[in-house]
Structure formats: structure tokens, C-alpha cells
Amino acid sequence: MVRRLHRKAGQSLIGRQWPAVELVFGCYFDEDLPLLMQMRNTHPDLQLNHALPYGAIIHDRGVQFVVFSRHATEMRLLLYDDVAQREPSEVVYFDARTDRWGDIWSVFVPGIGAGQLYHFQASGPFDPGRGLRFDPNARLIDPFAKALAGNFQPATDGVIRPPKCVVVDDYFDWQGDRHLRHDLSESVIYELHVRGFTNHHSSQSRKPGTYLGVIDKIPYLKSLGVTAVELMPVHEFPTNNFDGTTDPRRNYWGYDPLAFFAPHRGYAADSRPGAQVQEFKEMVKALHSAGIEVILDVVFNHTCEGNERGPVLSFKGLENPVYYMLENDRRYYRNYSGCGNTVNGNHPIVREMIFHCLRHWVHNYHVDGFRFDLASILSRDRSGNLVPNPPLVEAIGEDPLLADTKIIAEAWDAAGAYQVGSFGDDRWAEWNGHYRDDVRRYWRGDPGMRGKLATRLAGSADLYQA
């Protein structure tokens, strides 16, 4: 049975007075919370004077849920007791008078904590001509969700039911683990796919296809002289169809993301909600203990929501024209990614989300670097034009909290941009596509490649000035 809860001003969700809380003035970000919790051995006090940070924030007495939507007319929080549940156990209505701060919706739910399952649901105009695609029936993934649970459920009634978001406690005993800070010029980076690297019986992994399985491969990586592993996408991505049917070949590599803050649940040995968070951290800690850094292949250029014919899963149903680049005819999506849509990375709201996401992975997961897929998209303004000194690229390179982090660009996109040799400033490294292509052509036996091979082996002076 669905219980519809509505908090009136001055009342709790269940009709009692709000518990006494200490009002803490100022602002903190979600990546600061683990340190705050360790310092105080508790969860931070409920912040009633502002709506930040985003996502699901655990407090001693409950959880605060914060989401951005400019054009929503109504926001709801759907709470579930079980991963397999098709309908929510509780529906919490945000009060636009007391739970909305500008374009931020924020509500506190007492009596729940880590492990709680949830979706957002937003009502608003369905007006594709203005780029608005609100669907009051859609179950929406929190853009800041730190873990997902379950799979897409069969849409027998026409309603897509995506994996549920999980409220996550960020605490983990790192036992003094820190970033390794290997010099990039001395790094040997091994690109691997978590499942593909460990799933075959020949890998001799005790937990094949998982983060924990990677730990069993550390002696092999050390024997190769590897100093860093670059993990192909581990941000949450769908592996079954949106209608709940399965396809083992769908999105195997993971380059069709669903939730940027959440490690992929399919790589966890333990299927319980949120277990992937702990297992990912165990993997990073073990790799660091062996002197091996962890670099993530991140796909901030598009999502699995696709174009105007794609499903409403998260961003589309919260604020479509902010999160995505749209054509002048705003019914349609600009497609610089070749995957149906393009994330609007230099919009201030989206830029902030990406910025917080990078900090989240560095500070909560201790990752050592990022390889940015189709990074030239990050150089496009909100109209899709390539611009000098793009705000997002500059912000990533200048962030003092990412100063020890390796940042590597795949400096092109699917719409003709090619910035190898000129992406960002000296803070950015690049994948050298010319090196890859010329070495392949040489080994294939193409004529006239000896000189080009020499140029690449000598450092590509035609691209990079000493």
C-alpha cells in the first residue's frame, strides 16, 4: 500500500515536531562529509538554512534529499523497502513553499538511513518545443546517486522502472591509504575491463568478473611493470534493456552511462544494495598497497537516455534543456557524441555536477586520475561551438583538490573536433591518436610508414613542442 506523506510547514513527515537540531551556518560539499564524520564520529547535523549539497545526505536522525529542477511544478520522493518492489512503500511530497530553494528541491525524511532505496518523480510541462520532457509517471534516478540496486523491471504497464538509488554511508577504513603520485612521465598504464580481465577461468580469480577479482590479478600486473590501471567505464550503466528484457551483449564496455557518482553494481561479488561501494574501495586500497594507481575512464559526453526517442530515466525528467545540448529546434538533441545526445558540460549547473563528481571519486574512492572519453565535447559551449579556454576544462585543470590527479584527454569527438596537441594547457595529458594510428599502419605493413613511426617514437614533435 502506498502511503502519501506530505510535510506541512512546521510539522514532521509523520505529524510529530521536528527533532531538535543544531543549525550549522556555512556550506560544505559532499566530498567533505567522510572527513567531517571521522572528526566527529557522527553524521553532520541537519542543515536547515540551505539546500546544498545535492543527493541523499545522511544525518543522525534521517536523510536529506536534494535535487535540482527549474521547471518542475511538483517533486516527489519514492521510497522502497526492497529491490524487487515495483511500487513505492511511501511517497513523500516536497512542499514548494518550504522545500524549494530557488531551483533546488530539498526535503528531510526522519527515521531512515544508509541502504534506503529511492527514486525521484517530477511533474512539469511536457513541451518538447521548449525542450521540456517532464513525465509525471517516470521513476527518476538521482543524478547524484552514489549507488544503484537491481535492474530495469519489465514495463508491463508502460512505465519504465530503472534500478533504484541507494542511500550510501561514505565511511570506509582506508588504514592510511593515500594517492601514490607517480610521475606521469614514468607511468606504465594498463587499460583493462573489470569483467573481461577477470572473468575467464584462465584468470584464476576467486571472484571472477568483479572488483575483488582484480585484486587477485595484482601479482600479474606487477610482473608486467604496471604502475597504473585504467579501468574502462565503471560509472553505472545499463546492461539489460529498458523494458526489463536481457541482452548479454548490451553495453558490455560500459560507454553508455546512467549514473556518474555510482560504481557499477554488476562488478560486485556481493549483490546486496551498496556492496559495490565497499568492494570498489577494497580494490583501490589493495592496488595502492601494491604501488599501482587507479585511473578511471569517464564518459561525461552523453548518457544512455539517448535522443528524443529515448527513455526518460533521470536528467531528461528533471531538467532536459539544462543537462543536454539541444538543437535550435529544441525538440531534438545535438549529437556530438555519436550516441544520440550530448551532455551540456559547460552549462553552470552541469559543470558543477561534473566538478563534484570528480572530487567525489578522488576523495571518497581515492582514485588517482581520469581519462576523459571524447574530451573535445568538454570544449564546446552551450551552443556546441568549440571555444578557447572552455570553463569546464579550465576548472578541472585548476582545481587545487585535483592537483595530484592525472587528467588525460581523448582530444576529439564524433562531430569532427580533433584537438590532439592542443587540448587544454600543460596540466592536461592526451591520448595521441596519431601514435596509435601510425603504429598500427606500420605493423600492418602499409608502405611509407617508417618515417612516421620514427616521428611517433621520438615524441611526435609535429604535435608537441618541446
Model-identified regions with their sequence ranges:
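The feature marks proteins involved in alpha-glucan
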Residues: 28-60, 87-91, 100-104, 108-191, ...
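Structural beta-strand segments of beta-rich domains
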Residues: 61-65
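Short proline/glycine-enriched turn/loop motifs at strand-loop junctions of beta-rich domains
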Residues: 69-74
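Beta-strand signatures of extracellular beta-sandwich domains
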Residues: 76-78
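Core domains of carbohydrate- and sulfate-ester-processing enzymes
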Residues: 122-177, 239-256, 310-336, 446-466
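Conserved alpha/beta catalytic core and glycan-binding cleft of carbohydrate-active enzymes
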Residues: 145-146, 366, 379-382, 387-466
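Substrate-binding/active-site clefts of carbohydrate-active enzymes
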Residues: 193-212, 216-367, 371-398, 417
